[in-house]
Amino acid sequence: MKPSEMRNLQATDFAKEIDARKKELMELRFQAAAGQLAQPHRVRQLRREVAQLNTVKAELARKGEQQ
């Protein structure tokens, strides 16, 4: 999901998206520990998406406070 798409999400959707990505990240970490990780690039991608979601969420919160 692109940051421009993230900015169109509702507040409740941010929590759902972050939780879904963290859950998938946890599953991939278990696979990596077991040596069965098929897509190692997905771990980095998920970490980046979680960070982007948190950043956009904070930006929107700051924008709401300023108005």
From Swiss-Prot:
InterPro entries: Ribosomal_protein_uL29, Ribosomal_uL29, Ribosomal_uL29_CS, Ribosomal_uL29_sf. Keywords: Ribonucleoprotein, Ribosomal protein, RNA-binding, rRNA-binding. Signal peptide: none annotated. PROSITE patterns: RIBOSOMAL_L29. Pfam families: Ribosomal_L29 (PF00831). It comes from the Bacteria. GO terms for molecular function: rRNA binding; structural constituent of ribosome. One of its GO terms (biological process) is translation. One of its GO terms (cellular component) is cytosolic large ribosomal subunit. Gene3D superfamilies: 1.10.287.310. Binds the 23S rRNA. One of the proteins that surrounds the polypeptide exit tunnel on the outside of the subunit. Part of the 50S ribosomal subunit. Contacts protein L23 and trigger factor when it is complexed with the ribosome. NCBIfam families: L29. Belongs to the universal ribosomal protein uL29 family. PANTHER family: 60S RIBOSOMAL PROTEIN L35/50S RIBOSOMAL PROTEIN L29, LARGE RIBOSOMAL SUBUNIT PROTEIN UL29C. This is Large ribosomal subunit protein uL29. It comes from Deinococcus radiodurans (strain ATCC 13939 / DSM 20539 / JCM 16871 / CCUG 27074 / LMG 4051 / NBRC 15346 / NCIMB 9279 / VKM B-1422 / R1). The lineage of its organism: Bacteria, Thermotogati, Deinococcota, Deinococci, Deinococcales.
